Amino acid sequence: MVKLWRRYIPFINAGIQELISYRVNFILYRIGDVMGAFVAFYLWKAVFDSSQEPLIQGFSMADITLYIIMSFVTNLLTRSDSSFMIGDEVKDGSIIMRLLRPVHFAASYLFTELGSKWLIFISVALPFLSVIVLMKILSGQWIVEVLGLTTLYLFSLTLAYLINFFFNICFGFSAFVFKNLWGSNLLKNSLIAFMSGSLIPLAFFPKIVSDILSFLPFSSLIYTPVMIIVGKYDASQILQALLLQFFWLIVMVGLSQLIWKRVQSFITIQGG
């Protein structure tokens, strides 16, 4: 374990340093995310103001507000840029340096992202989560229940990130065949934002659409962890959701290994 840690700690440090080096870029993107969250809030406020009912699909305005906030936080922590990194490295030829290192190909990207995710969690997610937990407790909710849901949220969040990471690894492997993934990456991210419940909770879709989207792996990325922390899932629903996340994680890991074996024959180096 110590040997493994020493092998991958440079990648963790690289992820931290990259985030620090491009902090202005990171801040500007987050400002854009916050503006998007405000737009979503006022759109939902208009919907509830025009409705005669205090609840829509079981959500109050307070629930939707919490959903929007936690969707923003969850998206920060589950987002993976591994497909972009693979695409860029294949395009400029630097992928050969990663392939020559005595480390697992996918694990090198994983530990690089974990470095930046840890910094994001400490600086952004933890303050948000602490305030929400405190507000829930002050509102009269049982402390044990709040802490339990928070723990389950963090566990589900970890599974969500790993699912998204290995999905992006699978997608990134197509760069060995198509060489340029920039446009397809943008399309992929837009579709995932829709299907993950990041923009609209899946409960608001027609039942058959909601059932299909809820089974797909993308609902595990945002919708599942957010519904847990918002308190919209009971114990049996939480168990089913976590088991589904485990299922998709196993599928994505297995699929990444299978695709990696197939695409190695397509490796050609571009660049200088």
Feature map (PLM): residue ranges:
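Hydrophobic transmembrane alpha-helices and immediately adjacent juxtamembrane helices
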Residues: 1-272
